[in-house]
Amino acid sequence: SYPVDDDSIRPRRLIAYGGHGICMGFWGVTDGEAGHMVILETADDAAVRIDRTAGRLVAAPEWDAQKGALGYPRRLRYVFFDRGGHVAMCKRYRAYAKSVGRFRTLAEKRKACPAVDRLVGAVNVWCWDRDAVGLVREMQAAGIRRILWSHRRPPDQVKALNAMPGVLTSRYDIYQDVMNPANFTHLRGVHSDWPTAMWPDGLNLDARGDWRRGWRVHGKDGTMYPCGVLCDLLAPALARRRIAEDLKGHPYRCRFIDTTTASPWRECYHPDHPMTRTDSRKAKMDLLRVVSGEFGLVCGSETGHDAAVPVAHYFEGMLSLGPYRVPDAGRDMARI
């Protein structure tokens, strides 16, 4: 929240269809008691514009096109309050979320996935130390009892970690980026999660018919090589195959799916798998549902969006003060 006269806040546009915009489809203005809020009831192609009028912040809705047209009836709801301030707004949006099926507590999710108990209160550890079991023992001896181990390990270590009380085993996974195999010789390594077979027919195409650029990788020659973005419609089937094979030898109880709730819902113009942003959202949620529903795993994703509340258990980055990694976050230890 920001005071309307805070001149450090620059005008901006926040999409409602991705984690790096507004993660819940509402905003409001209050004097501490009275105020109003706006609920975006058709949020898949919507955004909020934050600007200044007479030196004060104002917010207004914007509608993005669906495949170049309005596409469908757009709907938003204004709600006015005489008391309650931001708490009343949050309660009102909570009621709306319940009415559209987006409200699901961890207690409810625990009934379907008992491993959720190991998630609650756990520190999220990303560590590339080879002796994961020894490090976890050391952490627990130091008083850190509940640990989400997020880096993939060999089967024997996963099994040993599973046998330790308070430990939730997980690994990284991603269903967005596909590198052109013609670039492999220029790279320092080939990511094991790139679904190379999806190049080029599985790529998301923009309105010009060009493949969308995703994550970029440093090449040995200093050039940045972009991945293509996989069409979201193809991700759930890919995940079913990959996760089923992985779990045969690696009994993880959790899986972190990168980018799914951080990247925006995207249109695709490929003739074999066209989609609107609404289709994209549904496919992304289907992907997470494969993890949590079909395989019964604790499911995490990046940044977070309330569309994923029914199918995900946690988000990385939701509590960060800024998007992405801040310059002095500590990961770049050679520089800091």
Task: Give names to the regions the model predicted.
Residues S1-M179, R253-C254, L288-V291, V298-C299:
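Carbohydrate-recognition beta-sandwich/jelly-roll modules
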Residues A141, N162, P195, P310-V311:
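Short glycine-aromatic motifs
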Residues P181-G189, W265-C268, G300-I336:
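Substrate-binding cleft/loops of secretory-pathway carbohydrate-active enzymes
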Residues C231-T303:
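Active-site neighborhood of glycoside hydrolase catalytic domains
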Residues A97-S99, L168, R188-S192, P274-R277, ...:
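Short, low-complexity, polar/charged sequence segments that are solvent-exposed and flexible
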Residues R118-D129, A142-H151, W215-R240, W265-S280:
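The substrate-binding groove and active-site-proximal loops of carbohydrate-active enzymes
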Residues G85, G101-F103, W194-A197, D279-K282, ...:
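Glycine-rich loops and low-complexity Gly/Arg-rich segments
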Residues R171-E245, D328-I336:
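Active-site-adjacent "subsite" loops/lids of carbohydrate-active enzymes
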